């Protein structure tokens, strides 16, 4: 089974394999997906810069891919990772650190 990239980008939810914490949400195009499969490190597509980026390439906070899951409609991906360092560019452990309720 493969993701359906017919509409372009797919949301990719990244989860810490050990703690099950949601670390971040990013977007993948087909090229980012293929690079992720090949390298076993996360690659995403930046909507603002319109280019691929490898998580941790600059900061060293890489994500080693442990598994990928595809949803029932083949239009969303969950990636479990071994996170090195923090996930959020703000320096927080996770991008989801603002509790609402």
Swiss-Prot record:
<dbReference type="GO" id="GO:0005737">
    <property type="term" value="C:cytoplasm"/>
</dbReference>
<keyword id="KW-0963">Cytoplasm</keyword>
<dbReference type="InterPro" id="IPR038019">
    <property type="entry name" value="PRib_AMP_CycHydrolase_sf"/>
</dbReference>
<feature type="binding site">
    <location>
        <position position="75"/>
    </location>
    <ligand>
        <name>Mg(2+)</name>
    </ligand>
</feature>
<dbReference type="GO" id="GO:0008270">
    <property type="term" value="F:zinc ion binding"/>
</dbReference>
<dbReference type="GO" id="GO:0000287">
    <property type="term" value="F:magnesium ion binding"/>
</dbReference>
<keyword id="KW-0368">Histidine biosynthesis</keyword>
<keyword id="KW-0479">Metal-binding</keyword>
<feature type="binding site">
    <location>
        <position position="72"/>
    </location>
    <ligand>
        <name>Zn(2+)</name>
    </ligand>
</feature>
<dbReference type="GO" id="GO:0004635">
    <property type="term" value="F:phosphoribosyl-AMP cyclohydrolase activity"/>
</dbReference>
<feature type="binding site">
    <location>
        <position position="95"/>
    </location>
    <ligand>
        <name>Zn(2+)</name>
    </ligand>
</feature>
<keyword id="KW-0378">Hydrolase</keyword>
<feature type="binding site">
    <location>
        <position position="88"/>
    </location>
    <ligand>
        <name>Zn(2+)</name>
    </ligand>
</feature>
<feature type="binding site">
    <location>
        <position position="73"/>
    </location>
    <ligand>
        <name>Mg(2+)</name>
    </ligand>
</feature>
<keyword id="KW-0028">Amino-acid biosynthesis</keyword>
<feature type="binding site">
    <location>
        <position position="71"/>
    </location>
    <ligand>
        <name>Mg(2+)</name>
    </ligand>
</feature>
<dbReference type="GO" id="GO:0000105">
    <property type="term" value="P:L-histidine biosynthetic process"/>
</dbReference>
<keyword id="KW-0460">Magnesium</keyword>
<comment type="pathway">
    <text>Amino-acid biosynthesis; L-histidine biosynthesis; L-histidine from 5-phospho-alpha-D-ribose 1-diphosphate: step 3/9.</text>
</comment>
<dbReference type="InterPro" id="IPR026660">
    <property type="entry name" value="PRA-CH"/>
</dbReference>
<comment type="subunit">
    <text>Homodimer.</text>
</comment>
<keyword id="KW-0862">Zinc</keyword>
<protein>
    <recommendedName>
        <fullName>Phosphoribosyl-AMP cyclohydrolase</fullName>
        <ecNumber>3.5.4.19</ecNumber>
    </recommendedName>
</protein>
<dbReference type="Pfam" id="PF01502">
    <property type="entry name" value="PRA-CH"/>
</dbReference>
<dbReference type="InterPro" id="IPR002496">
    <property type="entry name" value="PRib_AMP_CycHydrolase_dom"/>
</dbReference>
<comment type="similarity">
    <text>Belongs to the PRA-CH family.</text>
</comment>
<comment type="function">
    <text>Catalyzes the hydrolysis of the adenine ring of phosphoribosyl-AMP.</text>
</comment>
